[in-house]
UniProtKB/Swiss-Prot annotation:
S-adenosyl-L-methionine binds at G47, G48, Y49, D64, F91, D109, Q116. This is Ribosomal RNA small subunit methyltransferase H. Specifically methylates the N4 position of cytidine in position 1402 (C1402) of 16S rRNA. The gene is rsmH. It is found in: Cytoplasm. One of its GO terms (cellular component) is cytoplasm. Belongs to the methyltransferase superfamily. RsmH family. It comes from Rhizobium meliloti (strain 1021) (Ensifer meliloti).
Length: 341
């Protein structure tokens, strides 16, 4: 499933984007913040969750890999009376910023923030002309680097897996032909090409460029790898009884979170015909339902919530069995380092 992850209205809708914390009531219920607790918000963004957690009396350590978000949050930090700490960091490194006694909760809201989509110069939106960038931080490979340098076979895999784009081959070959004449520099350069190659049909609910832009953003920022590493980091950083709450917006992310909690449940079973058997001590037990979606009322008020899924678990006393990325069965894609030139 492909979705906008930017806030109040989707890119496909074409309306203004504003920040509305998704599933806020459900996130707070799963986290259970209270005075004396320390909660880590791994995706600070515009500070929606962090603000609500502070209001509930807990202290917050908030991370964001985007220096713009950290700068924008300074006023909130100063107003918190020392209860909010802001850190410029990837959330995959969250264990490095946890107190020695451990965390009482970790919340992750996966995806691009409304602030990033709003800024044309960040290059996240195909509806806003800007440099073809898409990096959540200033470092690393840009989307333009990928589009202009990646092999056609690599582009097909990136668009097909990360964007679930059925026309990946056609789009990749058109990119190869165009870049041989003129390199891609702006978001409109790429969006216009995609519109020409795969014109929008009356029945289409999303813009033809939606899936390719999603795929490039996920690839450039290694979002799936970051999420996988962050889940293992949270397992190490949470104290017994601490809670891990993750909100995702499309099937690739949700599959990773679901797989993680299943793997850490202490149960294993090969088919629906065989009973589950204990594999090892569980490191997480479920909080409420296995998956929580937004109510119809919230989805109508905030279109971003339509595809949101929340999964949560409580950390047990069992030791972490260690990080094993193979449980996620992620595909091997092109090397970001190689594409950087």
């Amino acid at each position: 499933m492909v979705t906008d992850q930017g806030g109040g209205t989707s890119e496909a809708d074409g309306g203004p984007v504003r920040h509305i914390p998704v599933l806020l009531k459900e996130v707070l219920a799963a986290l259970d913040p209270a005075p004396g607790k320390i909660i880590l918000d791994g995706t600070f963004g515009a500070g929606g969750y962090a603000s609500a957690i502070l209001d509930a009396g807990a202290d917050v350590v908030a991370l964001d890999r985007d220096p713009t978000a950290i700068a924008a949050g300074q006023s909130m930090m100063h107003a918190s009376g020392g209860r909010l700490k802001l850190v410029h960091s990837r959330f995959s490194d969250l264990a490095e910023h946890a107190p020695a006694q451990g965390l009482d909760g970790v919340v992750l809201d996966i995806g691009v923030s409304s602030m990033q989509i709003d800024e044309a110069e960040r290059g996240f939106s195909f509806q806003k002309k800007g440099p073809l960038d898409m990096r959540m931080s200033a470092a690393g490979v840009s989307a333009a680097d990928v589009v202009n340098r990646a092999k056609v076979s690599d582009l097909i895999r990136i668009f097909g897996f990360l964007g679930e784009e059925k026309q990946a081959g056609r789009i990749a070959r058109a990119i190869e032909k165009r870049r041989a004449e003129t390199p891609f520099e702006t978001t409109r350069d790429l969006a216009n090409l995609i519109e020409t190659v795969t014109p929008r049909k009356a029945k289409d609910k999303i813009h033809p460029a939606t899936r390719v832009f999603q795929a490039l953003r996920i690839f450039v920022n290694d979002e799936l790898g970051e999420l996988a590493h962050a889940l293992f980091a949270a397992e190490r950083a949470l104290k017994p009884g601490g809670r891990l709450v993750v909100v995702t917006f499309h099937s690739l992310e949700d599959r990773i979170v679901k797989t993680f909690f299943q793997d850490r449940s202490g149960k294993a079973g090969g088919s629906r015909h065989l009973p589950l058997v204990t594999a090892r001590a569980a490191t997480f037990t479920p909080v409420g339902k296995p998956m929580v979606a937004a109510s119809e009322e919230e989805a109508s008020r905030n279109p971003r919530a339509r595809s949101a899924k929340l999964r949560a678990g409580v950390r047990t006393e069992a030791p972490s069995p260690g990080a094993d990325l193979s449980i996620f069965n992620l595909p091997e894609l092109a090397s970001l380092a190689r594409l950087g030139g």
